[in-house]
Regions:
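Anion-binding alpha/beta catalytic cores of soluble intermediary-metabolism enzymes, centered on
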Residues: 2-237, 243-352
Length: 352
């Protein structure tokens, strides 16, 4: 099985090392890192941060215990080598090494640039096998697109393009893992009208194939229309597009069912009828999985040559710098990432 390739290279017998990128420095990412450092998640993983000293200093007063557990380094030490007098520390690489003032709640050009610099450095560490997985904290897509990289649409596409992956759906997929439900998205960050144009038989087969290759298990395809079209009364896409794609998938030997009524398919997955739901557009899948996970879903990118996960929330500029950021989502993601690295997830995973 590929969990984002190469995951679990050494983690069956050793702690997984996870590298976390800071996200937008004006968001809650830096505070979340300090909260994580103040109360490390456990003995089954080792953490390293790629984060600006300036960003962490800006919120140091909110979590002083976390700051005390950081060790700023030029290069990552050997695994398990971040101790000081018997105390376990978290290695931090500053991707910018510039003194500046970070203002929580307002993303400026420097914050967008720092987010990209941290992401690129963290990716390089995973690709060099210095870490087993990448966990990304939220960036502001619009800020990066405005200040640094026109056309930027988010981590998923950016990371895929950096690996030479060309087409969403065929080559890589956005997926979300909740404790009792797993969802992949046929279309990703698209306006709804455009996303519906992307619901084609070819796209469905591409996405199903990607999901089978990188995860496996029983896959239920969500319908597009209420009641999955009600025999054509409420729409014919199920009969003309989705059902033929499912039939072809089954001819290929894939364990696929549907199209199922969108108002029932997610509950059936939670009850064990399937391992995955392939949702047709962003909010169809995300509303269901976020409701089920109660803020603790893990965003997992299938198809990358390394394991990458992320939280299911955004930068939260409205509460940045106030000391009220909740790190429970990040802790859930770390636990899920360790399980992915060990091959314990996803549910219904391929074993060969």
């Amino acid at each position: 099985m590929s969990t984002g390739a190469g995951a679990g290279r050494r983690t069956a017998a050793a702690r997984a090392r996870l590298v976390l990128s800071q996200g937008d420095t004006a968001g809650i990412g830096p505070e979340l890192l300090l909260r994580l450092a103040a109360r490390p998640p456990g003995e089954d993983c080792e953490l390293a941060f790629v984060a600006e000293r300036a960003a962490l200093l800006a919120v140091r007063h909110l979590v002083p215990d976390g700051w005390e557990r950081l060790a700023f380094v030029a290069e990552l030490p050997a695994r398990g080598g971040g101790d000081r007098g018997g105390e376990s520390l978290i290695a931090v690489l500053d991707p910018v090494s510039e003194s500046r003032v970070v203002t929580p709640g307002r993303s400026a050009a420097a914050d967008a640039g720092g987010a990209l610099a941290a992401l690129d450095r963290a990716v390089a560490l995973v690709q060099a096998d210095e870490a087993d997985a990448l966990v990304t904290l939220p960036v502001a897509k619009s800020s990066i697109a405005r200040h640094r990289l026109p056309g930027f649409r988010g981590h998923t596409d950016y990371l895929a393009e950096g690996c030479g992956l060309e087409r969403y759906g065929r080559d890589y997929l956005m997926a979300f893992l909740a404790p009792d439900m797993q969802v992949a998205l046929l279309t990703m960050h698209e306006p709804l009208r455009r996303a519906l144009d992307g619901v084609t038989g070819e796209a469905v087969l591409d996405a199903l194939g990607c999901l089978v290759r990188h995860a496996g298990g029983r896959i239920a395809l969500a319908g597009l229309n209420p009641h999955a079209g009600e025999d054509g009364l409420l729409g014919d896409e199920e009969a003309t597009t989705l059902a033929p794609a499912v039939a072809e998938a089954r001819q290929r030997g894939w364990d696929v069912s549907g199209p199922e009524s969108p108002d029932a398919v997610f509950a059936r997955c939670r009850a064990g009828a399937s391992d995955w739901v392939l949702a047709l557009y962003h909010d169809q899948g995300l509303i269901a999985v976020k409701t089920a996970a109660r803020g603790e879903a893990t965003n997992w990118t299938l198809g990358l040559p390394y394991l990458r996960t992320s939280v299911d929330h955004g930068t939260a500029f409205d509460i940045a710098g106030r000391g009220v950021a909740d790190d429970s989502s990040l802790r859930a993601v770390i636990a899920t990432t360790v399980a992915l690295a060990r091959g314990e997830l996803p549910r219904g995973r391929r074993t060969a």
